[in-house]
């Protein structure tokens, strides 16, 4: 695709991890903070593949922990860009699991991560994202609605910050 548009696949990052005891919490499932760290890591690479500019993590939205990861599981984390606007881009992340002793596969989590370019305005302008698969088309079709919701959430946060007690 051209520099002004990319497919979701051109931004795809896949990362595999075996669950070890150091990853586990007191419930013997992978600690949520460990998952969030992996999410931020892989999604930032997808964002960089799309824009080749310095960007920062702005939000993690709709983090849904669907099924836990335990010892003898593998995690496959897939991240790809699902939308861009003036200075921001959205990355969808899904965590797929595999029980290594049985081969059974499952969805462990999903979320969206928003990144914002440091440059204002973004230079060069952010590319348009072109979905190809059914999954990508479904996710990209909801980008505009999620963008509107993020703006509403940001306005709410501004009001909340004014009322936070720092003592």
Feature annotation, model-predicted:
Residues 19-20, 65, 115-117:
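Hydrophobic residues in beta-strands and at strand termini
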Residues 8-21:
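Short amphipathic
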Residues 22-38, 164-166:
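A conserved, well-ordered hydrophobic junction motif at loop->secondary-structure transitions
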Residues 2-4, 8, 24-25:
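A short, mixed-charge helix-start or loop-turn motif at secondary-structure junctions
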Residues 3, 13-14, 70-71, 82-167:
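HotDog/MaoC-like acyl-thioester-processing domains
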Residues 24, 60, 117-118:
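Hydrophobic pocket-lining residues within nucleotide cofactor-binding pockets
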Residues 35, 39, 43-47:
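Buried hydrophobic packing segments
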Residues 2, 10, 30, 44-78, ...:
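Hydrophobic beta-strand-centered segment that forms part of the acyl-chain substrate-binding groove
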